[in-house]
Regions:
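Non-heme Fe(II) oxygenase catalytic core, chiefly the N-lobe of the double-stranded beta-helix
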Residues: 15-254, 259-288
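Single conserved hydrophobic/aromatic residue that forms the stacking wall/gate
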Residues: 1-13
């Protein structure tokens, strides 16, 4: 059932003490009292799924390491799994993307604001990441609420953006990106797609801005100069501090985020230290 603790909302299950607490005014909730390494019961999944739609990003604290097959199984509760167009897969578990940054890395995953693989025709709906190895300090992940970004535009500008579509490209992001992890991408064609600038969330019906600094390169209906000006304005707007929260990881924390209404940015401020974990990505549908 539900209970209120002060001004915070918690949800308690009769068989366990799952507790859901708002993480920041803009976005996110922290969840305690559920052991993801054992998977989710039907009742637990229902509570987690509701919280996912209500809060956009879920932070699961005090976790054990999730076995890869359980990680995959939890991801599949939300839908089919998405296969990354560029990154190396985990041996024996092709659905798992291993995140690993160390002293010799040329790049780090997600070190700019983005929504995961928005260049795909059907971009992923969500991502579930667990980190097992962390730097002593640094390596935080920031999240920004794209519902709020849309809602805080003037009504006139909302209407203008409602009629626009944008090109999302990935060649400049992925080409050669994973060469230090044994990926030879010679001859590979990386995806690009056109999506609405404002997308409607298929489960909540709410509108969210859907342009990001990593993948979005051009607004289709505008001239090049107009496109650059409008895109720069929107990207700066999306990155406002008041739409954001910042998560400091502890070992084995798990974060589940909704790519349809949230952008994120993984800070690479910990070189030469190491950061490592595993993620599954849940397939989504074509934005509208």
């Amino acid at each position: 059932g539900f209970c209120l603790v002060g001004s915070e909302m918690c949800i308690r299950d009769s068989n366990m003490s799952m507790e859901i607490t708002r993480f920041s005014p803009a976005v996110g909730a922290e969840i305690r009292g559920v052991d993801l390494s054992r998977g989710l019961t039907g009742e637990e999944f229902k509570e987690v799924h509701k919280a996912f739609l209500d809060h956009q990003v879920l932070f699961f604290r005090e976790q054990k390491e999730i076995p890869p097959e359980v990680h995959v199984e939890i991801g599949k509760r939300f839908g089919n799994l998405h296969f990354h167009p560029a990154a190396p897969q985990m041996e024996g578990h092709p659905e798992i993307f291993v995140i690993h940054t160390h002293r010799d890395s040329k790049i780090a995953n997600g070190e700019f604001w983005h929504s995961d693989v928005s260049c795909d025709e059907e971009p992923p709906l969500g991502t579930m990441l667990q980190l097992h190895l962390l730097p002593p300090v640094g390596g935080d992940t920031l999240f920004s609420n794209m519902y709020q970004a849309y809602e805080e535009l003037s009504e006139t500008f909302q209407k203008f953006c409602d009629g626009l579509s944008a090109l999302h490209e990935s060649e400049h992001v992925y080409r050669g990106r994973y060469s230090d992890r044994g990926v030879d991408d010679a001859g590979k064609v990386y995806p690009s797609s056109v999506h609405p600038v404002v997308r409607t969330h298929p489960e909540t019906g709410r509108k969210a801005l859907y342009v990001n600094r990593a993948f979005t390169t051009r607004i289709q209906e505008l001239s090049e100069d107009e496109s650059r000006a409008v895109l720069d304005l929107l990207l700066d707007h999306c990155e406002q501090l008041s739409f954001q929260t910042r998560f400091r990881w502890q070992k084995n924390d798990v974060v589940l985020w909704d790519n349809r209404c949230v952008q994120h940015h993984a800070l690479w401020d910990y070189w030469p230290e190491e950061r490592k974990g595993r993620r599954v990505t849940i397939a989504g549908d074509r934005p509208y």
